[in-house]
């Protein structure tokens, strides 16, 4: 159950960050991805994040550790996107 809560918190954080730093819709229309390209990109991102490798000890459950992991994931996403 804790794993689901952590994953949900990460998804919410990513959505909030993406929404606050979103690009105008007009710019995205020119660079539309096909469904297969989008699926491949999402698979690559999930592999890069390696969410299934989260530690289940006390340290991993602390907020500081989760914040550190979130920063690492965001850096990976930024590198992947740009």
Swiss-Prot record:
PTM: Cleavage of the propeptide depends on the processing quadruplet motif (XXXR, with at least one of X being E).
Keywords, alphabetical: Amidation, Antibiotic, Antimicrobial, Fungicide, Membrane, Secreted, Signal, Target cell membrane, Target membrane, Toxin
Keyword NAD attached: no
Signal peptide interval: 1-22
GO CC annotation, single: other organism cell membrane
UniProt cross-references to Pfam families, sorted A to Z: Latarcin
S-S bridge residues: none
Record propeptide residues: 23-61
Gene Ontology molecular function: any one: toxin activity
Localization per record: Secreted; Target cell membrane
Family annotation (InterPro entries): Latarcin_precursor (IPR018802)
Tissues expressing the protein: Expressed by the venom gland.
Biological process annotations from GO: defense response to bacterium; defense response to fungus; killing of cells of another organism
Motif Processing quadruplet motif mapped to chain: 58-61
Location of Alanine amide modifications: 81
Additional facts recorded: Negative results: does not have hemolytic activity against rabbit and human erythrocytes.
Notes on the domains: The mature peptide (62-81) probably forms alpha-helices which disrupt target cell membranes.
Record-stated family: Belongs to the cationic peptide 03 (latarcin) family. 03 subfamily.
Function: It has antimicrobial activity against Gram-positive bacteria (A.globiformis VKM Ac-1112 (MIC=0.3 uM), and B.subtilis VKM B-501 (MIC=1.2 uM)), Gram-negative bacteria (E.coli DH5-alpha (MIC=2.5 uM), E.coli MH1 (MIC=6.0 uM), and P.aeruginosa PAO1 (MIC>40 uM)), and yeasts (P.pastoris GS115 (MIC=20 uM), and S.cerevisiae Y190 (MIC=20 uM)). Causes paralysis, but is not lethal when injected into insect (M.domestica) larvae. A second study reports antibacterial activity against E.coli (MIC=100 uM) and S.aureus (MIC=84 uM).
Protein name per its UniProtKB record: M-zodatoxin-Lt3a
